């Protein structure tokens, strides 16, 4: 549940705490007055800008590419999709004053995307109403325009699937402002910055008009600290961001009906949401399987691709050396496939 300070109530409470011990029993303070204080130095500062996010699949769409000729073709898998992203802001510890206090902020957050172990930078733009605990949600649309060349073998069909992954993260935010008192209200000391005053009967000195300055607010709540002249109030907010992180195109290759051939799956390079960064398939990490990596140095032909054959019986009958696939790697992929 949100916490809310009220400067007027806190000023009255601080005055009671300070003057209370000196009030003659049986009497009640009179002529209570809240002076025209000022608010300034309104600041918003993120508490953390580095996040680790586990991505989740947000959207996928597929298209088929056909090659019914006897020669390999280069075709293009093209996608143009848009996804809605949200930024929700909630004040968790706010303050009420005589005026509306709000501030806008823009900052860059760095997000470590787990599974691909890459960091992207995103700009978060928000606005905070210090006196409202209502969650404010803004939406934007991000476009994903992908055009990837794909080699389609003879008499084959290739299914290209665009997969868009998103992630959520929450930015803790620190809010602060200063409370300035009104000067010229205290007789004999016109420079005293009065915030609140009341008249009471002092047990020893009789009738007294007692003024307090903004720094006294710390007596009412630990949300305030004193700098000797003003009170500095500190609060909190949260900003929850849900946005696209990266996209990847999965390629499923299979022979057309009535033709023999290999069936395989592989991934095209990843596109991060800050689109200037393109990742090669080998950087996807263990969470997204790469079906056609480059063999290690123990293979007979170092630059030969490893192909996973989904037809397991044909796969077992093949001569791995002739296909340029290492025995140990072929056995490993066979075991991995059996587990699926």
UniProtKB/Swiss-Prot annotation:
Stretches the record annotates as Disordered: 318-340
GO biological process: sporulation resulting in formation of a cellular spore
SUPFAM superfamilies, sorted: Aerolisin/ETX pore-forming domain
A Pfam family annotated for this UniProt entry: ETX_MTX2
Keywords tagged on the record: Plasmid, Sporulation, Toxin, Virulence
Annotated GO MF terms: toxin activity
Cross-referenced Gene3D superfamilies: Proaerolysin, chain A, domain 3 (2.170.15.10)
Leader sequence segment: none
Origin: domain of life: Bacteria
Keyword tRNA processing annotated: no
Annotated function: Promotes colloidosmotic lysis by binding to the midgut epithelial cells of lepidopteran larvae.
UniProt protein name: Pesticidal crystal protein Cry15Aa
